[in-house]
Design a protein with these regions (language model features):
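Surface-exposed, charge/polar-rich loops and edge strands
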Residues: 1-287
Length: 287
């Protein structure tokens, strides 16, 4: 998340979504979300710092998505973005006053201990509950861990606004499954072992791969799979997930797995007992 200003002094927020083209002479094209979008027109320049500016190219969607050009000093755009940007926290976590201590804390905590590759617009938050110590204890108890790469997309934040859920358009999210992970998961299924997904994006990744190949295969692909009742799961048996926003696709996914009435009863109990919801909140184990 980048905060900058137009030459008029107007404050503009630029939320990076995905890289659209490779760097050429300190320039890159990205798809972004701009707020407030109405203040921006094609060729508007948004200055982030002395080493980074953003030029609007064209509007992609009415919800504020734009194609922009990043203009920066140096040859490593990620270094520039890390110096000038902030962790892309969900909109319900407010950081009204710039605070370097909070920025450092969010950078450390708003990503999993096993995170490696750049690419997500948000953390796969179910994984935030795991420490290296917990993962080691699970392995010592005979739990086999398989890792997939998830590029969590903007759709994570978007509510369903259609009267008919079948008309909702899911945003695409990219993922990667390694040969090792594919072998682990297929072997576990063949042996009748339970597959426990950590997070809803993991669910969509594995179910998408199975739908495409009939099993889990190593691949670098994307998912537009919208899971809602009465979806029949092919890969996952259990799920570790946080408590989700109302009207979200994630709430529909967990309802497909556990049943709407069961999930709503669980949420009612969570509210009565003051559980923490959303990204930095508590989680549930659905089995």
């Amino acid at each position: 998340r980048l905060i900058g200003h137009k030459d008029t002094g107007a404050k503009i927020e630029v939320f990076l979504l995905k890289q659209n083209s490779k760097m050429q002479d300190e320039h890159e094209n990205w798809e972004v979300l701009i707020k407030p979008s109405k203040r921006v027109k094609p060729d508007t320049i948004i200055k982030i710092s002395d080493e980074l500016s953003v030029r609007a190219i064209k509007r992609l969607e009415e919800n504020g998505e734009w194609l922009v050009e990043l203009i920066f000093n140096g040859n490593n755009v990620l270094d520039v973005l890390h110096r000038n940007g902030n962790i892309p926290l969900p909109p319900y976590i407010e950081r009204k006053i710039p605070n370097e201590d909070l920025k450092k804390l969010d950078f450390e905590r708003y990503q999993t201990v096993y995170a490696k590759d750049e690419g997500s617009v948000a953390a796969p938050t179910a994984g935030l509950h795991f420490t290296k110590e917990i993962l080691k204890k699970l392995e010592n108890k005979g739990v086999e861990l398989a890792y997939v790469t998830l590029n969590v997309g903007l759709g994570t934040f978007r509510p369903v606004q259609c009267e008919n859920v079948e008309n909702h358009k899911m945003h695409s999210e990219t993922f990667e499954i390694s040969e090792k992970a594919a072998e682990q998961i297929n072997r576990a299924k063949a042996e009748g072992k339970k597959i426990v997904a950590v997070g809803t994006t993991t669910v969509r990744t594995l179910e998408t791969a199975y739908k495409k190949f009939g099993c889990i295969k190593a691949c670098h692909d994307h998912s537009e799979l919208f899971i809602y009742p009465p979806y029949e799961f092919k890969v996952i048996d259990n799920l570790i997930t946080n408590f989700h926003l109302p009207k979200s696709t994630l709430l529909m996914l967990v309802s497909a797995l556990a049943g709407k009435d069961f999930i709503f009863d669980a949420y009612k109990e969570a509210i009565e007992n003051k559980y923490r919801f959303f990204s930095y909140g508590d989680c549930m184990y659905i089995c």
